[in-house]
Amino acid sequence: MVTIIKPYFCEHSTDSFRGLVDVWGERGYCKVKPCPVPTYSFNTDVLNLPEAKCWMGDVGDIMLYDFALLDRIPADRNWKFSLWANSMLEGERSSAWSFWPKHSKLYEDFKINSRFSYDDREVLLGFVGSKTTPLRTLNWEQCCDFFILTASGDAYSPIGYLEVLSKMKFGLCLPGVGPKCLRDIEYMGLGVVPVITPGCSVEHFNRIEEGVHYLKANTPEEATELVGACSREKWKMMSDNCIEWFEKNSSIKGTFDTTMEILEKNNIGI
């Protein structure tokens, strides 16, 4: 059984990927060990230390880089192999990875009864989120029949937020802190067809395809045109494809299996 070393002194230690690691451990997919808290000087940015990353094996083995940007890479770049969830550092010892919901355990329970039919979804195109980047502008409100952009992101409880998403046929994707946003994956797992906009990334180890899993719009006007022209039959096909991709790549079991698949295909021993 593989071991994953997880730091507990950083943000998001109980949600996103680091919360997902705990669920992997609970299910017996891997052993989870706390990363030792490093000794550092007063002016050190601890998030740049190797001990602030998740690792498979030991520190320095397989880095599981779950930060949004490339500003938290260990200075010595001393790893045997690396997986990149959001922004990606290209190189021989690296691979694109996957992405996941913010609260995987809660999401796993919620999705069971929340994958609605076309007619049971009241919102044609929607978005709900916070203004984490200047790229998230109100310009996009004009193409949505449900649009909430808050300063703090606390408009809904985690369950309330997922309930809102589940009532959308199409979900607008705007860049987050990095080029990917957890919301995009949360759309897919609920059968909401993503509408990708400039600045968003769709790069994953197992790729998603335009016209198969998502639509792509460069402007609000184009988004309106695309969702308006999409037949319910095509929407159903894309919605089903999104759910299938999510289960294989972003569910609790799917993320672990994809992680191991990447390592196997790159001949990386654990």
Task: Give the label of every model feature segment.
Residues 222-226, 241, 254-262:
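Alpha-helical elements of Rossmann-like donor-binding domains used by nucleotide-donor carbohydrate transfer enzymes
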Residues 1-212, 216, 248-267:
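Nucleotide-sugar donor-binding catalytic core of glycosyltransferases
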